[in-house]
Amino acid sequence: RNIYCENDANCFALSEAKDGSASHYKIVFGVILGSGCGGGLVVDKKIISGKNNLSGEWGHNPLPFYGINEDISVLQSTLDTNLDIEKFISGKGLEALYFENFKKKISAKEIFSKKNENLKFIENFLNRLARSLSLLINIVDPDAIVFGGGVSNEIENLDLLRDMTGNFAGKKSIKTSFIKPKFGDASGVRGAAILGRDTIY
């Protein structure tokens, strides 16, 4: 019996590109913002893994830096040289940053549930996310970006996020569609099933 393995973010992207919310797009990038920060690239409904199987690992790039005061304070308050995007916009990253700022240990879900209390913190998160997504636009320029994962579920306005991303990508407006997944949290498992079926048959 053969066993096939694939990255969860790739499976998520495949599911949504095959017959999910991004089924009518050619180039689809799936973003998973959960405890970590992952991604998957699908072109013509096929996963693009790359020579090193790293094509979707955008979260391990350094956070684009624009001299934002809040970023400077983070750099000054830690000796950690890890400036990966994942450190700033993933669930675990947000929890660590929140503790550094307020000396309180709360979950990422709690941060967003107390929106009024944490408005500036959430604004900083969206700003960093938009900067990070601008890298995807400038390098891959996908037709659509599908957002999955617990942190993504907390983003209320994807159109606003798209406009912010466009500004950092050097255009006032971008045509890339920012969309929610049709199959929600089940899309990764579903994509794995699709991949297994297509590989065998």
Give, region by region, the residue ranges found by the protein language model:
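Phosphate-binding/catalytic loop of phosphoryl-transfer enzymes
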Residues: 1-80, 191-201
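ATP-binding/phosphotransfer module of carbohydrate and carboxylate kinases, centering on a glycine-rich
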Residues: 16-24, 65-201
